[in-house]
Amino acid sequence: MLNSNDVIANIAVRSLDTARKFYAGTLGLKEVDAEGEELIVFKSGKTSLFVYRSEYAGTNKATAVTWVVGDEIENDVRALKAKGVAFEHYDMAGLKREGDLHVGGDMKIAWFKDPDGNILSLVSG
């Protein structure tokens, strides 16, 4: 039923100004639309990320958005660190840590948070 439809990720934030600086300035996403002080739409590849103002910002304790970056993961982690992004380190069964990367077999993943504490990640594929 929904297998041929695109999916849009939604992130709750407290301040759209702060979110705009992070998602556009730090992560390099392109802002394509906005609805006043309530919503910003960013483009990432062929998908969209809706960032909206909410009192529940940052309350999700699980990964909210993952970017599949392939072999660029190590370069992307370095570039984001250079922009001040701090990476999270977790103890997880089946994964070993190599610096800021968690590695399991051929998969590499790195987690970080936005200014509201939403958990985001990069994965090698």
Q: What is the predicted role of each segment?
A:
Residues 1, 31-32, 40-41, 55-57, ...:
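Short secondary-structure boundary/capping segments
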Residues 1-20, 48, 62-65, 123-125:
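N-terminal beta-strand motif that seeds the catalytic metal site of vicinal oxygen chelate
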Residues 49, 58, 96:
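Flexible, glycine-rich phosphate/dinucleotide-binding loops
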Residues 33-35, 71, 103-105:
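Short solvent-exposed loop/turn micro-motifs enriched in small/polar/acidic residues
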Residues 19-21, 52, 61, 75-77, ...:
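Short acidic, gly/pro-rich beta-turn/loop elements at beta-sheet edges
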Residues 1-2, 6-14, 40-43, 56-125:
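Vicinal oxygen chelate
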Residues 10-49, 54-55:
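Core segments of cupin and vicinal oxygen chelate
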